[in-house]
């Protein structure tokens, strides 16, 4: 049985490991769902540079300067980027936020702006799958959403990613039937929304 792992906030010096897991996670999870040329073009070095900048902003509690990691410029809500770590090795990460009316659909905004959460990403090193790391990171995110006063949270999952849908459903998330097309990564990807209530 593998040794225990801990969950802690990400810091700028974790950027390379986070980028490595993100790239490996994309190549593992999205093979056959995303054009192979795009997956092959993913660069740990380029992602490290972007991630270092984002984690630096996050550590200073500054609003994000771009939406490259799922938040809009000027977002004044709460953000968290947590790592699962064993013996200083990063095994996975979970990035989530909460804000009043934190929704991708303007028509869902409510008067008074109820606090809503959003799970932006959850990736595990493919070599560390099946060790409870994803469940632990998700449990941390859900308890944080509740502590922040969120009434609900949502995420988007790539069409055809049945492994992710099954994982999220086991954690209590449900498909809403809503879809969107994401072009932010240079390819057209259809995503399905999932939500959870608190």
Predicted segments, located by residue:
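Active-site acidic-Proline motif in GNAT/NAT acetyltransferases
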Residues: 125-127, 131, 159-160
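Basic/polar N-terminal segments that are highly enriched at the extreme N-terminus
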Residues: 1-2
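C-terminal "cap" of GNAT-fold acetyltransferases
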Residues: 113-117, 151-154, 158-165, 169-198
């Amino acid at each position: 049985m593998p040794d225990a792992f801990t969950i802690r906030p990400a810091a700028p010096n974790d950027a390379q490991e986070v980028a490595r897991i993100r790239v490996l996670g994309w190549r593992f999870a999205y093979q056959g769902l995303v054009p192979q040329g795009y997956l092959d073009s993913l660069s740990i070095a380029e992602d490290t540079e972007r991630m270092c900048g984002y984690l630096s902003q996050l550590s200073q509690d500054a609003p994000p300067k771009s939406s490259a990691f799922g938040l809009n410029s000027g977002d004044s809500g709460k953000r968290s980027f947590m790592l699962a770590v064993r013996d200083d090795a990063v095994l996975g990460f979970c990035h989530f936020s909460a804000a009043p009316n934190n929704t991708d659909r303007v028509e869902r905004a409510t008067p008074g702006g109820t606090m809503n959460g959003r799970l932006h990403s959850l990736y595990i090193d493919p070599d560390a799958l099946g060790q409870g790391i994803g469940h632990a990171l998700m449990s941390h995110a859900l308890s944080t959403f509740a502590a922040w006063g969120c009434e609900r949270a949502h995420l988007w999952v790539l069409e055809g990613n049945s492994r992710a849908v099954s994982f999220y459903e086991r954690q209590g998330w449900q498909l809403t039937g809503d879809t969107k097309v994401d072009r932010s990564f240079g390819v057209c990807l259809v995503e399905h929304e999932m939500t959870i209530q608190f």
